Amino acid sequence: LHRLIRRQRQMCIRDSYGVQLFDLAGQTRPKAMYFSEVMSYIQLTGVIFPYISEPNINIHQPAYGISSTMCHELSHICGFMREDEANFISYLACYNSDNTELRYSGAMMGLIHATNRLYRYDPNAWQEIYTLLPEGVLRDLAANSRYWKKYETPVGETADRWNDAYLKANDQTDGVQSYGRMVDLLIAFYRAQGLI
């Protein structure tokens, strides 16, 4: 897995959008977290250690999420502290990449947040869209759900409450819901592009 994160980090560095994130972040490079499964138990895919500004990545998560997590954490290093903004910047960096794996990572992150939001508001529309997704994407979504379901424990719920309180204390009034607010930024972006 450490090789995987090194390879994905190298892809980010070579990619034009990834280069911009790495340039802005200075010499900071994401590192594989040795205790990645512990991060899964507390429902984290990445974290910045505040005093040394070091992005650490949960490499135990589904592999396609590693690149978007790296870009998300690098967005924080670049000064974008709001979770919705970091997710949106990560989406743009990955999705506009020349690398297929990076594009897929960003697309899956955007898809997961968008379909989760849609399901809350209109389960019928969600079902309609879900049936249109390619078989490989459906397999990855099912694997993602199975993976995170294993970590829905009292420890995870407590960590989620702590993260929610931390975000709210840092002026992100939506708390953990702010991660999914990237959908608002996606909609605004695609509207500005005249695509919706």
Locations of regions flagged by a protein language model:
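Second-shell loop/turn segments in exported
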Residues: 56-60, 71-78, 100-101
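Active-site scaffold of zinc-dependent metalloenzymes
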Residues: 27-70
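Active-site/pore-lining binding-face segments in mid-to-C-terminal subdomains
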Residues: 88-140
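A cross-kingdom signal targeting lumenal/periplasmic-facing segments of multi-pass membrane
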Residues: 20-24, 28, 35-40, 55-56, ...
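Active-site recognition of the HExxH zinc-binding catalytic motif
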Residues: 68-80, 84-87, 91
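Single conserved hydrophobic/aromatic residue that forms the stacking wall/gate
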Residues: 1-13
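Pan-zinc metallopeptidase signature
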Residues: 136-196
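Sec/Tat-exported extracytoplasmic proteins
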Residues: 17-21, 59, 78, 82, ...
